[in-house]
């Protein structure tokens, strides 16, 4: 679950972390009220969307008067802001108005989970303000990595090591890293990114930007944070899928995918790409999907106007092939299927599943294996 910058900063402020004074504004009137509350100019106005690289896309501006604030707010609120990370753009429905911070030096700092060694990874760099993806390509040696054992927690020697590598006061920076680590753990975050973290001209350290992402699997432990989620930043089909406990992520291709199991879903998308096509989504119906869930999954899948063909790839284990077939038959009663559907079934009750589909009268194309299914789906989508 992604949070807006202003929400992330409010959470981090509770841990005693230094963030600029600021207010969220949903319209021009609130933007002006925020400016008045902050005591004047210059101010920084930031578009609040769930995408990085906002500054390069014109989503961040320093304003020095009421006129500039009003003009920028009117120009960007309600508009779609496209960035490198979000080429299709996101609607700007709110702004963050902050006091401008006098910057001496910018740094990068993030905390995430490194699954390869089951440790918490802290990344830092003197190259603040750059996207970490760009930095890893252009200057990989500029990224400092420190691994933390979650059982032991972050140790004093690790905060000192990071401080010395960045050339920052160990006492001041060490406390900030420790508090950020505590916030990361308490919030069940999957990512906590500060870019940039800045050293001011007065020698203070300030979190100039903040991104917090909460692990969806732990959201039930944070009902107050769950309520902060801005569904306007999420694709409507993803919101719909979440209601039925489906793992759905919209992509840019035209081959719809329905698969059971995340690993098989990833493999299916890879095979579609290998065969020269492009998947339109990630959709894992899971092992214990009911007939109703399968029907809703198919309905959501075919609601995407970009989908020109569907590849259903099921290996029946916990999710039996006959149950999947019944779900598809139920979905066909609800959805007027106008696009080609390719089905590959293997595993538990596969013959029963194939028989049900054959006797249903549905015009589904059968595939003998994944490669055959991918090729057929791509051909039918043309």
From Swiss-Prot:
Cofactor detail note: Binds 1 Mg(2+) ion per subunit.
Cofactor(s) essential for the protein: Mg(2+)
Binding of substrate, residues: 260, 317-319
InterPro entries the record matches: ATP-grasp, ATP-grasp_succ-CoA_synth-type, ATP_grasp_subdomain_1, Succ-CoA_synthase_bsu_CS, SUCC_ACL_C, Succ_CoA_ligase-like_bsu, Succinyl-CoA_synth-like
Binding site for ATP: 46, 98, 101, 106
Broadest EC class assigned to this enzyme: ligase
Record GO terms (molecular function): ATP binding; magnesium ion binding; succinate-CoA ligase (ADP-forming) activity; succinate-CoA ligase (GDP-forming) activity
A GO biological-process term: succinyl-CoA metabolic process
Enzyme Commission identifier(s): 6.2.1.5
Occurrences of domain ATP-grasp (ranges): 9-240
Involved pathway(s): Carbohydrate metabolism; tricarboxylic acid cycle; succinate from succinyl-CoA (ligase route): step 1/1
Domain of life: Bacteria
Cellular component, GO, one term: cytosol
Binding site for Mg(2+): 195, 209
HAMAP family referenced in this protein's UniProt entry, alphabetically: Succ_CoA_beta
NCBIfam families: PRK00696.1, sucCoAbeta
Role of this protein: Succinyl-CoA synthetase functions in the citric acid cycle (TCA), coupling the hydrolysis of succinyl-CoA to the synthesis of either ATP or GTP and thus represents the only step of substrate-level phosphorylation in the TCA. The beta subunit provides nucleotide specificity of the enzyme and binds the substrate succinate, while the binding sites for coenzyme A and phosphate are found in the alpha subunit.
Oligomeric form and interacting partners: Heterotetramer of two alpha and two beta subunits.
Entry's family note: Belongs to the succinate/malate CoA ligase beta subunit family.
Protein name as catalogued: Succinate--CoA ligase [ADP-forming] subunit beta
Species the sequence originates in: Hydrogenobaculum sp. (strain Y04AAS1)
Phylogenetic lineage: Bacteria, Pseudomonadati, Aquificota, Aquificia, Aquificales
